[in-house]
Amino acid sequence: MGRFIFLSSGLLVVFLSLSGTGADQGCLPDWTLYEGYCYKVFKEKKTWADAEKFCKEQANGGHLVSLQSSEEVDFMVHQTFPILRYDFVWIGLSDFSRDCQWKWSDYSKLFYKAWNNEPNCFVCKTTDNQWLRRDCNRQQYFVCKSRVPR
């Protein structure tokens, strides 16, 4: 009986420590689940290419975040603002090949847009739904996104 209570208590502690992190839904620890994807804000600055490479190394299928709706942008702003305050984060949209073909790094289709014309990679403000083009070699904070593993 004592072993059963100890084991049950241990499982409860593990469950409570994982709840709310997305881990109970298949996300890595410290990643947040939203609409079938896992997200993580990184509070370190990298160039666009280095941030994209880093995201690929963090999670299977990971990339810089692609934003497909205003609701997803609102979710991301809700995640980034408490951590980064008034700043910008790299998103996965770029014209890295400089051929005027804007593409998401995860190869998803570009349906939703919120920008003005400037350089070749994009940041999103941490306070609202505004995208700005930036020089890809500039160092910025970033958000990674990956599908929930099946």
Curated annotation (Swiss-Prot):
Q: Which cellular component terms (GO) are annotated to the entry?
A: extracellular region
User: What are the disulphide bonds in this sequence?
Assistant: C27-C38, C55-C144, C121-C136
User: Which InterPro entries did the record assign?
Assistant: C-type_lectin-like (IPR001304), C-type_lectin-like/link_sf (IPR016186), C-type_lectin/snaclec_domain (IPR050111), C-type_lectin_CS (IPR018378), CTDL_fold (IPR016187)
* Entry keyword annotation includes ATP-binding: no
- Expression (tissue specificity): Expressed by the venom gland.
Q: Name one Pfam family in it.
A: Lectin_C
| Superkingdom per UniProt | Eukaryota
Q: Give the protein family.
A: Belongs to the snaclec family.
Q: What is the name of the protein in this document?
A: Snaclec rhinocetin subunit beta
Species: Bitis rhinoceros (West African gaboon viper)
